[in-house]
Amino acid sequence: MHVVRLSIHRLRRFQTVELHPSSALNLLTGDNGAGKTSVLEALHLMAYGRSFRGRVRDGLIQQGANDLEVFVEWKEGGGAAVERTRRAGLRHSGQEWTGRLDGEDVAQLGSLCAALAVVTFEPGSHVLISGGGEPRRRFLDWGLFHVEPDFLTLWRRYARALKQRNALLKQGAQPRMLDAWDNELAESGETLTSRRMRYLERLQDRLVPVADAIAPALGLSALTFAPGWKRHEVSLADALLLARERDRQNGYTSQGPHRADWMPSFHALPGKDALSRGQAKLTALACLLAQAEDFAFERGEWPVIALDDLGSELDRHHQGRVLQRLASAPAQVLITATETPPGLADAAALLQQFHVEHGQIARQATVN
């Protein structure tokens, strides 16, 4: 899939601006604070329902405005499938939102998020590796959400059961009142965990060659999954029963896939905690690119790939390796930088360049 039009209204520095990117490599340059990242934020907002830099109400809406609007038009399919044009719009006030997809109102943000797939690498992406388990769970679930049509229903089923069980625990409910929600949590949780495990195994097969291509010095060798309870010893139903009294005392559910995690392993490093910030960024980028490749294999088309501030996040050597990997794939890529990154200098003829300044985006002539 590739975006053919991105229209942004009242978002940070932009009053009204439109971008018509190419279907391949795109570079947006401009001074710090010019609004380059805001372009990717708008795209990310449509694909995830949130910005990668915080909540909508935390500064994303232009000062003095009541809401923001983002409109995206993109092509999907092609090849063996019939290409079609899709359109989505989102208006967000920070508290309330309205959305449309292909001319119809949508009742849930998930409908918009399921339609447009964007893989984003930005300065905070290192937390995928160096942070807590929540971003790693979201990473797994994003991949499943986009390649398994019924995954969102399963995830919501588990989340609802977890919410109800936790509410009863906080109320100090009697054990018999927990039985029904324990059964629901165990049934949906076992299925959710099996899906995550299969996905991570498949992703590992894609990740190792990607990491070897863009950062061979990392020596990334495997991904290890922790399901959130001692699954090799007991079922989730038994784990919930065994932990019931402790959970009642603490007021929350301590066992289950909401506590799951996964970790990368390396040939020459003891684990992710031994990584430098730069190594964590490279590992995160390798994971994201592997996820994009898996999406492409399963769906028959690539997601849009957004790389924010590439020049300051990766050195020239790694920029070149990443670009080489992306150039071999029919993916639309949007890159931001204050100036053309050294790793992209030799690929100027392949780039569609844009300059962002004073709240406007100007298309620049392609270098031949």
Curated annotation (Swiss-Prot):
Keyword Cytoplasm annotated: yes
Tell me the disulfide pairings in this chain.
none
> What protein name does the entry list?
DNA replication and repair protein RecF
The answer to whether UniProt assigns keyword Cytoplasm to this entry is yes
Its keywords, alphabetically, are: ATP-binding, Cytoplasm, DNA damage, DNA repair, DNA replication, DNA-binding, Nucleotide-binding, SOS response
Xref: NCBIfam families: recf
Give the GO biological process terms. DNA replication; DNA synthesis involved in DNA repair; double-strand break repair; SOS response
Q: Which family does it belong to?
A: Belongs to the RecF family.
Q: Which residues bind ATP?
A: 30-37
Q: Where in the cell is it found?
A: Cytoplasm
The gene name reads: recF
Upper lineage = Bacteria, Pseudomonadati, Pseudomonadota, Gammaproteobacteria, Lysobacterales
